[in-house]
Amino acid sequence: MITAPFFTLDRRDLLGIEGLSAPEIVGLLDLAEEFVVLNRQIEKKRSTLRGRTQVNLFFEASTRTQSSFELAGKRLGADVMNMSVGNSSVKKGETLIDTAMTLNAMRPDILVVRHHASGAVALLARKVDCCVVNAGDGAHEHPTQALLDALTIRRNKGRIEGLTVAVCGDVLHSRVARSNILLLHTLGARVRVVAPSTLLPTGIENFGVEVHRSMESGLEGADIVMMLRLQRERMAGSFIPSVKEYFHYYGLDEAKLKRAKPDALVMHPGPMNRGVEIDSAVADGAQSLIREQVEMGVAVRMAVLDALARKLPNATGAERD
């Protein structure tokens, strides 16, 4: 069994990439590298969270993120409880604050929360006494997705600084895009966003990105092509003429990918809409990192839980205020 180096985040919660320093991000990525090694061994357990309780509270349905956090917690020795909101008091009219206070009375050590409203996780974090991890809030942030994407890029390219990363698709509704832009910018990458005007948030230029409205110009010379899911469930109006037309202009196929560098790599946070934002030949091709992203997700979430756990009372290596 490996012995990972101690790394402690100087905060109780991980609510977003915004506010994280470059050394904090790199520290989490370095720790996650150790967990990649651990997860490829027969014995995958560590005891950082032994005796601790982790509650996964998902107000939005998720398969991969919830499963990834559950596996991460269990591999660190935590008692993990998945709370089904569909069968909870929330469906009976209980407010988010009431839910937070009820959970807090049960004295969990870590809450992993996904919510459909931007800012809801930060609000909940102010009402509880335990560590809180944002597993995605509205169109705001998804910090662990950005961290796992960064780890995937760094392992395959050897660096992040100086790379050109094209983030393509439904930027408007994407918390993944926002967190990735913040992280990549912090670590020195050149970031482009590629989307039709209807799927670009107002003021996106203020994030220090290049804005392209065509895949042809946006992918030119890119090192990484990061596709985003078209989130039709969040679209109340007509953001695109049709799925067929969207794929024609903004779906990643082999012809469009040739605009990027010959050694460019393709990413997607999942779940994918094949034939909408990405062609199967590209998703399953030699340049795709999509399956590797899933593996990195468990390691990154273990790193986040491990780093936050060291701030818990009586934790090994814990800092006391």
From Swiss-Prot:
Annotated EC: 2.1.3.2
Pathway(s) the chain acts in: Pyrimidine metabolism; UMP biosynthesis via de novo pathway; (S)-dihydroorotate from bicarbonate: step 2/3
Single biological process term from Gene Ontology: 'de novo' pyrimidine nucleobase biosynthetic process
Swiss-Prot/TrEMBL keywords: Pyrimidine biosynthesis, Transferase
InterPro entries given in the database record: Asp/Orn_carbamoyltranf_P-bd (IPR006132), Asp/Orn_carbamoylTrfase (IPR006130), Asp/Orn_carbamoylTrfase_sf (IPR036901), Asp_carbamoyltransf (IPR002082), Asp_carbamoyltransf_Asp/Orn-bd (IPR006131)
Residues where L-aspartate binds: 92, 175, 229
Record's subunit section: Heterododecamer (2C3:3R2) of six catalytic PyrB chains organized as two trimers (C3), and six regulatory PyrI chains organized as three dimers (R2).
NCBIfam families: asp_carb_tr (TIGR00670), PRK00856.1 (NF002032)
Function: Catalyzes the condensation of carbamoyl phosphate and aspartate to form carbamoyl aspartate and inorganic phosphate, the committed step in the de novo pyrimidine nucleotide biosynthesis pathway.
Designated name of the protein: Aspartate carbamoyltransferase catalytic subunit
Organism the protein comes from: Azorhizobium caulinodans (strain ATCC 43989 / DSM 5975 / JCM 20966 / LMG 6465 / NBRC 14845 / NCIMB 13405 / ORS 571)
Gene name linked to the record: pyrB
